């Protein structure tokens, strides 16, 4: 039995949820998100809560129900509050600059790295070494942050590179003679 799927999702004020043909759509101040629910599951909208219907004896439905509930909850939080990931650049000469929907990164390569920001995501640079990725879809925000980090992942000896703001880099000791 999935413990996550048993919890109903409360819908905050300002968020409108509709269910049609296995597609759940949430509309709020941060935009519109929709997600297809697996055919073997059911979704009920009662009052201000959303709940998942599933067969508790079926192992596949148990797994799908918990995941679907988490995805729907993230969708509702995304259209009401949004999600953000903060990244920081550590290294001499490493800097970032956002120009419209293009993020320009100087990461020690012979050329600047130009990253095209996908629709639905906003990238801000409060300072030259800080990047903030914001959006309504949690999965897309996390993927964009991971793509930016992948250009120059932090190395373990000096810790230089692009890292998440809350990330701790485990450092290695230099080779001894």
Curated annotation (Swiss-Prot):
Stated role: This protein binds to the 23S rRNA, and is important in its secondary structure. It is located near the subunit interface in the base of the L7/L12 stalk, and near the tRNA binding site of the peptidyltransferase center.
Biological process, per Gene Ontology: cytoplasmic translation
Keywords: Ribonucleoprotein, Ribosomal protein, RNA-binding, rRNA-binding
Disulfide cysteine pairs (residue numbers): none
The gene coding this protein: rplF
Listed name of the protein: Large ribosomal subunit protein uL6
Assembly, per entry: Part of the 50S ribosomal subunit.
Molecular function GO labels: rRNA binding; structural constituent of ribosome
């Amino acid at each position: 039995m999935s413990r996550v799927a048993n919890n109903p999702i409360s819908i905050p004020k300002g968020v409108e949820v509709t269910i049609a043909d296995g597609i759940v759509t949430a509309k709020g101040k941060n935009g519109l998100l929709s997600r297809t629910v697996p055919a073997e599951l059911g979704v009920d909208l009662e009052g201000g809560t959303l709940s998942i219907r599933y067969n508790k004896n079926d192992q596949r439905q148990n797994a799908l129900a918990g995941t679907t509930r988490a995805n729907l909850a993230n969708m509702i939080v995304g259209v009401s509050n949004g999600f953000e990931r903060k990244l920081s650049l550590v290294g001499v000469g490493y800097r970032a600059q956002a120009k419209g929907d293009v993020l320009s990164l100087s990461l020690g390569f012979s050329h600047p790295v130009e990253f095209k920001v996908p629709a639905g995501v906003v990238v801000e640079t409060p300072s030259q070494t800080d990047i903030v990725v914001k959006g309504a879809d949690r999965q897309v925000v996390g993927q964009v942050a991971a793509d930016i980090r992948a250009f120059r992942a932090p190395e373990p000896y000096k810790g230089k590179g692009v890292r998440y703001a809350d990330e701790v880099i485990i450092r290695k000791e230099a080779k001894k003679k």
